[in-house]
Amino acid sequence: MVAEHQASPANVRVKRIAGALGAEVLGLNCAKTLSGADVGALHRALTDHLVVSLPDQTMSLDDLERLTDQLGGRMVTPFVKALDDRPYVIRVLKERADKLNFANAWHSDLTYLPEPPSFTLLYAHEVPDYGGDTLFQNQYLAYETLSDGLKQTLRGLRAVHSAGAAYGTGGYLDQVKQHMSTPVAPSPDAFKEVVHPIVVTHPESGKPALFVNPVYTVRIEGWSHGESQALLQYLYKHGLNENFTCRVRWAKGTLTIWDNRATQHNALNDYAGQRREMYRTSVAGAAPKAA
């Protein structure tokens, strides 16, 4: 269903941060329950810009969970240990002595699930003096700028997704977890596979988007590993063009929300010796539909 564009409340101001995607949203106080009109304005900004950053928020974890519910409802993040008393909230933490950070690779969140999240919320509690930005990429543009012939080919294909390489027993995060402060929980369950269309239709904008990413997309259904990698690596190289990206620079109190159905992101690890503490929730989504 294509979202209707209605006038935003007078208190809400939206300012683009890059040409490809991303906007700053001003005038909302997320420490309070947002009105229906304000939620609608925030949702429209997400539909239009895919990534929205709300600076100078003073939010509790109750506030973060309430806003998550207002945007569609909470969901659990597998293979990452949640806070003891909050099963839907994870702490993304890098201590000063840590060499590695969490999510330092291009990916879309939880695409290894049958129903990946629609949105992700990330709130900055403590940030380094410099560095620690997050890069975002527009999967609409990644698809739109392909040739007509390749677009047609991709519309008939599905890809296999799995968390095994990242979160499986013996996988990357299992091997390096002692060097990270974000508590991961590797499991043999991470090797389970799901299949999604390579090109999906966004349920609100109605636009087609690529739906593959280097971390969780394993292969193309029915293709060999070599055949799959040849095409997938081309799509990654094409889609991760810097002209399709934006950068969010964090400050204490920044809340950033992104549309996981049409973006990838990458958390930079360029702040050695400094501490960064963030809190993250995910909004429940639906099974991706083929374009």
Protein language model features and the residues they cover:
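Non-heme Fe(II) oxygenase catalytic core, chiefly the N-lobe of the double-stranded beta-helix
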Residues: 2-255, 260-291
